[in-house]
A protein has these predicted regions:
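Conserved phosphate-donor/acceptor-positioning beta-strand/loop module used by diverse small-molecule
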Residues: 89-91, 100-125
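PAPS-dependent sulfotransferases, especially Golgi type II membrane carbohydrate sulfotransferases
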Residues: 124-247
Length: 247
C-alpha cells in the first residue's frame, strides 16, 4: 500500500484484505520485509500531511484539500476490515496529535515510551544505516533543529528524542485520558502478551495474540561503545530534565 498505492491506499488495503498471509512483526527502523507486512505508511502520510523540515512546524497539519480523502480512506478501511481499528505508527505523528484530534475527535492515541538512552542509541544507529552520516537526521525533526545541529551527534539524538516526548506530552494534556494510553517498550519486551492485552482492551478488541518472549531477539546496537557511553553520560548529567523518559 505504502510503496505502490500511496495516493490511493484503499486499493492496497482491498488487495491485502483478500489475501491470507502470515505477518511477522519484526522490523528494522520501521521497515519490514514483504509487500503485505506492517508499514509506517510514510508515503501515504506524506500525501496527506506533506513533508519538509522542521516537521514540527511545516508538517503538523493536514494539507489543504486533503481532509476529505483522509476521512474517506479511514472510513473505507474500517468497512474493509470489519470494524477493526486502523493503527498508524509513525514518528512524524508525534507532532500531529492536535491536528489528528481535530480531524478525528474519537481517535485514540498510544504513547509508546522507551528509555531515552536506548531510543537515542537507536536514533543514532539509524543515521549511520540510512544516511551514512551521524550528522543527518533520519526522520521527523523538532522546531529547534537548527539549535540542535550545534551539538555533537550523540547529544543531538538525545535532545531529538526529548523533543518528541515533550511534544506528545503537551498535546495529550488537551485530550481526555480515556482516549490515550501510555506504555513502555521495555515492558513489552518483558511480557509482550500482558502489554498487548492492554492495547487490545484500550481499543475494545479481543486479544488473540500468543507471543513467546523467548523468541524475541535482543538487538545489539551498531554504534561504538564510546558513543553509547557518551549518551549515558549526557543523560546522567541532565537526569533531572530527562527523568520522565528514563525507564
Amino acid at each position: 500500500t505504502n510503496e505502490i498505492y500511496p495516493l490511493n491506499p484503499i486499493i492496497g488495503l482491498i488487495i491485502q484484505s483478500k489475501v491470507n498471509v502470515s505477518i511477522p512483526l519484526s522490523n528494522k527502523f520501521g521497515k519490514t520485509k514483504g509487500i503485505f507486512q506492517p508499514s509506517e505508511g510514510s508515503y501515504v502520510l506524506l500525501n496527506w500531511f506533506g513533508g519538509g523540515h522542521p516537521s514540527q512546524t511545516v508538517s503538523k497539519k493536514i494539507l489543504k484539500g486533503k481532509n476529505k480523502h483522509f476521512r474517506a480512506t479511514l472510513a473505507a478501511s474500517e468497512i474493509i476490515f470489519n470494524g477493526a481499528p486502523l493503527i498508524i505508527k509513525n514518528p512524524w505523528n508525534c507532532f500531529r496529535i492536535s491536528s489528528i484530534r481535530k480531524l478525528l475527535p474519537k481517535a485514540k492515541f498510544i504513547w509508546l515510551k522507551r528509555d531515552i538512552r536506548k531510543s537515542a542509541a537507536s536514533d543514532l544507529e539509524s543515521r549511520y544505516l540510512t544516511k551514512k552520516n551521524p550528522n543527518k537526521w533520519n526522520s521527523a525533526t523538532p522546531s529547534n533543529i537548527e539549535k540542535l545541529k550545534l551539538l555533537p551527534p550523540v547529544h543531538q539524538v538525545i535532545e531529538n528524542q526529548f523533543e518528541f516526548n515533550r511534544s506528545i506530552k503537551a498535546n495529550l494534556k488537551n485530550i481526555p485520558s480515556k482516549n490515550w494510553i501510555t506504555l513502555w517498550y521495555e515492558d513489552i519486551l518483558e511480557d509482550t502478551n500482558v502489554e498487548l492485552k492492554k492495547i487490545s482492551s484500550f481499543l475494545n478488541r479481543d486479544y488473540k495474540f500468543n507471543t513467546n518472549k523467548n523468541k524475541i531477539k535482543k538487538k545489539i546496537r551498531n554504534i561504538s561503545s564510546e558513543e553509547q557511553k557518551e549518551i549515558n553520560k549526557y543523560v546522567n548529567i541532565h537526569s533531572k530534565r530527562f527523568k520522565e523518559n528514563l525507564y
